[in-house]
């Protein structure tokens, strides 16, 4: 799938603009602070109804404007298209429309417009908290396993109920048994989906990484959040008093993690910044392959400042892998010439110059390298 039309109003320093991107490679270049990343942010807002740069939405809205609005026309694999629209005002109210109909859940946006973000904060996937790696994992499961969302909602409800009882309820075995059983059932289902996903992801990730980086000894493993040799219901029973003292459930899928190591060391501790970036890129690209294999369409990749941390050889390798995905890619850089050799002659490339918030399309999506 791809965005064939994109309209942006009221996003940071960007002037109101309507673009017709290439279905494949789109390069946005210009000085730092010109607004390149803001366009990626607008696409992210369209796909997830939130920014990747700020938890608060007020900084995203152009100064003295009441709201920011993004519209997009999405071309689907079945030759149909869908119209998406997202608007957020300064009070925090969000309006989502799909094909003219109001929608409540941002999950419907995510399902229609699967986005992969690679930006300077991507290092956090390796060095940050387990929550970030769970989000990465669950994004992938969500897009390949249609039953995941229902199980996830049951898990969250059971967790809320048990945690509330731990903090405020009377300590009795009947209540604990009820909440623990519901939590265990949902947890086993979530764990099964995650485990199957990791089994599919690992070989694709390893193959992708080899194309980017000569790195021996890197391993990817999955920790489910409780003892692999014990049923969760037994773990919950044995840790009841401790959970009660802490006021929350300490074992379960909400404590899961992906572990990337080189030998016995965490990858983030021993890899250079450039190596870390390539590992994260390999993970994101592998996810895109799995989405495509699941017949769920293709991801759209948002790559902010692709050249940073990478030498010419690794920039070229990354461009080639993104090109081989046959998906739509939006890339920002300061100097577009460093990416000119990254694409095949027949790959449609569109070039956009960004200056002081003004976006000018220099080359339309043709079959000739820009």
UniProtKB/Swiss-Prot annotation:
**Molecular function terms in GO for this entry?**
ATP binding; single-stranded DNA binding
Task: Identify the InterPro entries for this entry.
Answer: DNA-binding_RecF (IPR001238), DNA-binding_RecF_CS (IPR018078), P-loop_NTPase (IPR027417), RecF/RecN/SMC_N (IPR003395), RecF_2 (IPR042174)
State the GO CC annotations.
cytoplasm
Question: Cell membrane: is it a keyword of this entry?
Answer: no
Q: Name one GO biological process term.
A: SOS response
Q: What is this protein called?
A: DNA replication and repair protein RecF
Gene responsible for this protein: recF
Q: Which SUPFAM superfamilies match?
A: P-loop containing nucleoside triphosphate hydrolases
For this UniProt record, the keywords arranged alphabetically read as follows:
ATP-binding, Cytoplasm, DNA damage, DNA repair, DNA replication, DNA-binding, Nucleotide-binding, SOS response
Q: Does the keyword DNA damage apply?
A: yes
Family, according to the entry, reads as follows: Belongs to the RecF family.
Under Gene3D superfamilies, the record lists: P-loop containing nucleotide triphosphate hydrolases, RecF/RecN/SMC, N-terminal domain
The UniProt record gives the binding positions of ATP as 30-37
Localisation per UniProt entry: Cytoplasm
What organism is this sequence from?
A: Stutzerimonas stutzeri (strain A1501) (Pseudomonas stutzeri)
Task: Name a Pfam family for this protein.
Answer: SMC_N
Q: What does this protein do?
A: The RecF protein is involved in DNA metabolism; it is required for DNA replication and normal SOS inducibility. RecF binds preferentially to single-stranded, linear DNA. It also seems to bind ATP.
């Amino acid at each position: 799938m791809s965005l064939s039309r994109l309209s942006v109003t009221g996003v940071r320093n960007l002037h109101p603009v309507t673009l017709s991107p290439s279905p494949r490679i789109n390069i946005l270049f210009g000085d730092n602070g010109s607004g390149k990343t803001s366009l990626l942010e607008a696409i992210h807002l369209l796909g997830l109804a939130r920014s990747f740069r700020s938890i608060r939405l007020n900084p995203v809205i152009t100064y003295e404007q009441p709201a920011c609005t993004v519209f997009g026309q999405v071309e689907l694999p079945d030759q149909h298209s869908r119209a998406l629209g997202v608007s957020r005002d300064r009070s925090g109210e969000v309006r989502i429309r799909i094909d003219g109909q109001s929608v409540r859940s941002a999950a419907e946006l995510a399902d229609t417009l699967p986005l992969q973000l690679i930006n300077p904060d991507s290092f956090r996937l390796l060095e940050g908290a387990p929550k970030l790696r769970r989000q990465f994992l669950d994004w992938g499961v969500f897009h390949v396993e249609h039953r995941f969302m229902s199980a996830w909602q049951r898990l969250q409800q059971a967790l809320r109920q048990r945690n509330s009882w731990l903090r405020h309820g009377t300590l009795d075995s009947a209540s604990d048994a009820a909440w623990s059983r519901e939590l265990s059932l949902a947890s086993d289902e979530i764990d099964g989906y995650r485990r199957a996903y990791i089994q599919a992801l690992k070989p694709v990730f390893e193959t992708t990484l080899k194309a980017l980086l000569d790195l021996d000894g890197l391993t990817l493993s999955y920790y489910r959040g409780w003892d692999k040799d014990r049923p969760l219901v037994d773990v919950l029973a044995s840790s009841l008093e401790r959970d009660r003292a802490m006021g929350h459930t300490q074992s379960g899928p909400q404590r899961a993690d992906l572990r990337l190591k080189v030998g016995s060391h965490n990858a983030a501790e021993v890899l250079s910044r450039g190596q870390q970036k390539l590992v994260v890129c390999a993970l994101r690209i592998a996810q895109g392959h799995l989405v495509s294999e699941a017949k769920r369409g293709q991801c759209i990749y948002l790559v902010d400042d692709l050249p940073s941390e990478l030498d010419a050889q690794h920039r070229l390798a990354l461009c080639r892998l993104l090109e081989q995905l046959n998906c739509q890619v939006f890339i920002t850089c300061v100097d577009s010439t460093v990416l000119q050799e990254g694409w095949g002659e027949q790959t449609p490339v569109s070039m956009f110059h960004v200056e002081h918030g003004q976006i000018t399309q220099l080359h339309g999506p043709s079959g000739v390298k820009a």
